[in-house]
């Protein structure tokens, strides 16, 4: 007991750690965690009719009331969908109290308190250029929503994923992926954080150094234009090939590298 945990990682990172399992192993350890204000994780087993989350705590159960299900910087009310979608997934929380029952106590939990601590001690201090782990929670055509700690969400726009153009983020990532990102902006008034990934993939020169003129390389067709076909050789490196019939965006292609022009940052294929 009392060992420190890196608790400000994306939600789900703590649940299988030895420390977390130890805290959930007995009534005494759960009470210790409550008194010490330790952030823990458990799996949300169900959402009841009042939209409270019931969480598995080893041999015990805990309840996160709807109003304690999430922290909002602007004070907006927790949406039903934000609670319901946590069912079956790990949730972070602090133990705030107990309700004594006939057989076992039920623990009162607050995910909001755990997220508030993460915001105050980590997220609010993030600055442009800071690098962090992010877990992709879901994907839309305009970008990826990412958990950057304790279920707090930031946006990775599609045009910040790579220099090479992609039509949809799913061409790079899927929900559940844990990736490295850099903070692009942090609006502390609205709580909106924007991430970028492409700067971590190396410069054009670093990517081009892996290829030489005269080589044949595998690439992915990213766009087809009247004047040629853009083929991605690496996430931050694409070249222009001559137009040919039968090319399909997203398909793999073998291309011959005609020339690499560092001064123009161009690759002719």
Language model segments and positions:
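Single-stranded RNA-binding regions, centering on S1/OB-family and related RNA-binding modules
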Residues: 1-269
